[in-house]
Swiss-Prot record:
Belongs to the class-II aminoacyl-tRNA synthetase family. Its EC number is 6.1.1.21. Pfam families: tRNA-synt_His (PF13393). The keyword Cell cycle does not apply. GO terms for biological process: histidyl-tRNA aminoacylation. It catalyses: tRNA(His) + L-histidine + ATP = L-histidyl-tRNA(His) + AMP + diphosphate + H(+). Its main location: cytoplasm. PANTHER family: HISTIDINE--TRNA LIGASE, MITOCHONDRIAL-RELATED, HISTIDYL-TRNA SYNTHETASE. PROSITE patterns: AA_TRNA_LIGASE_II. It comes from Endomicrobium trichonymphae. Keywords: Aminoacyl-tRNA synthetase, ATP-binding, Cytoplasm, Ligase, Nucleotide-binding, Protein biosynthesis. This is Histidine--tRNA ligase. One of its GO terms (cellular component) is cytoplasm. It is found in: Cytoplasm.
Length: 414
């Protein structure tokens, strides 16, 4: 008998295995520079975890999950995505109480019963990051920047960022009601849309079959509450402040039910027509819904095979070393935007040619004393302080966290 890899799976060896290792090493460097720590979770979990978090009416749960029973009749599932498992670990190990401001990344195999095609498999590799404990739009902006930074670091330069706001539990029901009324007037919806109309109408906006029929579809932006409007507006302002171009796509809804407020995709023509290479968004309710302490969060993931197709199997694979932790603080909160821009620049380019660094901060709305305590807690080697007096002379203070000495530097030198 001739045995072959099951349909939708593939063996990775030679240049492809080297490319996978290279991509993962690149990702670790970028994640550590942004202050994220690695977490590894099991490849299978209680099936109910994914049903509860991803959503009973999503395509993943209804059609794509690999579910099985063990010898004790426990219903288990191979993980279809990484966020639910990481949130489960975050709660189980009491990190929602002991370290609610956590930054974590993961990489590993995921499993979905999908139709195999270029860059899409039933067993595939995913790289992702989750930022817990911040409801600030700065966290949304940083996650989008992080995803773009990772893709650009492996040579993908032609890409487009698409963003949207899905609102929250307060304003989304009003949009849902209006959308259902509108969709009820659209004739000849496809089978998937008819099924979603009753269970998950927002997903209809993402339908590739019927999209040309939705000529007068309601706009989510018209139904956002003031809080969601302000959140989305500030996210856009922060992206603009660091020179990031983006497009607001009001039909961008994502395929997972846990998303709230900001969602995004980064698309490229490198693999197919505007194919999504990375995607994510905010999920402020998921930790609480899974039994943890209410904790806002935002994250993203990318498919490794699809990204490697986009970089066309490069033959150069880098190495990485432990990085030096740098914290960015603000003595005057009015300088937060300038400090944020400086932090993003340092994350992208390093400091004076030194790229082996991890950059943390700035923290919005905290006193300088609190920020310095945080710098000590994360064992930062140096803290860069943006203060009004020095900033007016184009300078900042660099504080050595070991001997507490500090030196002034011109911002332009960095």
């Amino acid at each position: 008998m001739n045995y072959k890899a099951p349909r939708g799976t593939h063996d990775i060896f030679g240049i492809n295995a080297s490319g996978m290792s290279w991509l993962e090493q690149k990702a670790k460097v970028i994640f550590k520079r942004h202050g994220f720590e690695e977490v590894r979770t099991p490849v299978f979990e209680d099936a109910a975890l994914f049903m509860r978090s991803i959503g009973q009416t999503t395509d993943i749960v209804e059609k794509e999950m690999y579910i099985f029973e063990d010898r004790k009749k426990r219903k288990l599932a191979l993980r279809p995505e990484g966020t639910a498992s990481l949130v489960r670990a975050f709660i189980e190990h009491r990190m929602d109480v002991s370290m609610p401001a956590g930054r974590f990344f993961y990489m590993g195999e995921m499993f979905r019963y999908e139709r195999p095609q270029a860059g899409r498999y039933r067993q595939f590799h995913q790289i992702g990051a989750e930022f817990f404990g911040s409801s600030s739009p700065a966290a949304d902006a940083e996650i989008i920047i992080l995803a773009q930074h990772l893709l650009s670091s492996v040579g993908i330069n032609e890409m487009n960022i698409y963003i949207n706001s899905l609102g929250c539990e307060k304003c989304r029901p009003f949009f849902r009601e209006t959308l259902v009324k509108y969709l009820g007037s659209v004739r000849d919806l496809c089978e998937d849309c008819l099924r979603r109309l009753e269970k998950n109408p927002l997903r209809i906006l993402d339908c590739k079959t019927d999209s040309n029929k939705f000529t007068a579809v309601p706009r989510m932006s018209d139904y956002l509450c003031n809080c969601c409007k302000d959140n989305f507006s500030l996210t856009q302002s922060l992206l603009k402040s660091v020179g990031y171009n983006y497009t607001v796509d009001e039909r961008l809804v994502r395929g997972l039910d846990y998303y709230t407020k900001t969602v995004f995709e980064i698309r490229s023509d490198a693999v197919g027509s505007q194919c999504a290479l990375a995607a994510g968004g905010r999920y402020d309710n998921l930790v609480g819904e899974l039994g943890g302490q209410d904790t806002p969060a935002v994250g993203f993931a990318l498919g490794s095979e699809r990204v490697l197709l986009a970089v066309q199997k490069t033959g150069f694979f880098g190495s990485f070393q432990e990085s030096e932790k740098i914290f960015i603080a603000v003595a005057d909160q009015e300088l937060f935007s300038e400090a944020f821009s400086f932090a993003v620049k340092a994350m992208r380019n390093g400091l004076k040619g030194n790229k082996n660094i991890s950059v943390f901060g700035p923290i919005n709305g905290k006193s300088l004393t609190s920020q310095l305590k945080f710098a000590d807690k994360i064992k930062a080697v140096k803290t860069i302080v943006f203060a009004r007096t020095e900033f007016e002379y184009g300078k900042f203070l660099m504080k050595n966290m070991k001997d507490k000495t500090q030196t002034e530097f011109l911002i332009s030198e960095f």
